[in-house]
């Protein structure tokens, strides 16, 4: 059977943490159906260019939520919600093992973005990127 993946709009003040909550009140704006797609929990539009050219702003990424940061596969691409001084920062990055205990290294595909080490405890939500969809024309 063809999987029906909910597509959410998290532009503006919306954040990932409620989207990942078990009883989320966020309504999908649409549904995506792709043959042979691995199991996904949802999809969102990409904003920003940290993973450009692999994924660019406006692309759709499909994700599978992780309940525990320790389940990360080092080197894979993730959608992350990070606590930055009380504000939520949403990003798509490769997650690599850090040399520092209790930290992870966030790596961009885009060479104009520097790698960043963050404390694991600052990660509010994390999801593995399973697929992406790129539109070449709109309309």
Describe every region a protein language model picked out.
Residues 1-57, 67-71, 135-139:
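Short, positionally conserved secondary-structure boundary motifs
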Residues 5, 90-93, 127:
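Small-residue-enriched segments and motifs
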Residues 12, 85, 111-112:
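Short acidic/polar capping segments at secondary-structure boundaries
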Residues 21-26, 61, 95, 109-111, ...:
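Short intrinsically disordered coil segments
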Residues 36-101, 105-107:
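Hydrophobic protein-protein interaction segments
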Residues 27-34, 93, 116-120:
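Generic detection of short hydrophobic beta-strand segments and adjacent strand-loop junctions
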Residues 100-103, 108-139:
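Amphipathic alpha-helical interface segments
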Residues 9, 94-97, 131:
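A residue-level detector for short acidic-glycine micro-motifs
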């Amino acid at each position: 059977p063809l999987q029906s993946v909910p597509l959410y709009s998290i532009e503006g003040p919306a954040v990932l943490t409620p989207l990942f909550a078990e009883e989320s009140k966020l309504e999908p704006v649409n549904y995506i159906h792709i043959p042979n797609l691995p199991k996904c929990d949802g999809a969102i539009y990409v904003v920003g260019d940290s993973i450009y050219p692999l994924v660019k702003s406006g692309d759709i990424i499909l994700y599978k939520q992780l309940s525990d940061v320790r389940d990360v596969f080092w080197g894979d691409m993730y959608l992350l919600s990070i606590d930055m001084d009380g504000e939520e920062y949403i990003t798509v990055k490769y997650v690599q093992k850090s040399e520092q205990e209790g930290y992870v290294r966030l790596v961009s595909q885009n060479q104009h973005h520097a790698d960043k080490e963050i404390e694991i405890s600052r990660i509010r939500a994390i999801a593995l990127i399973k697929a992406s969809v790129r539109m070449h024309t709109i309309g």
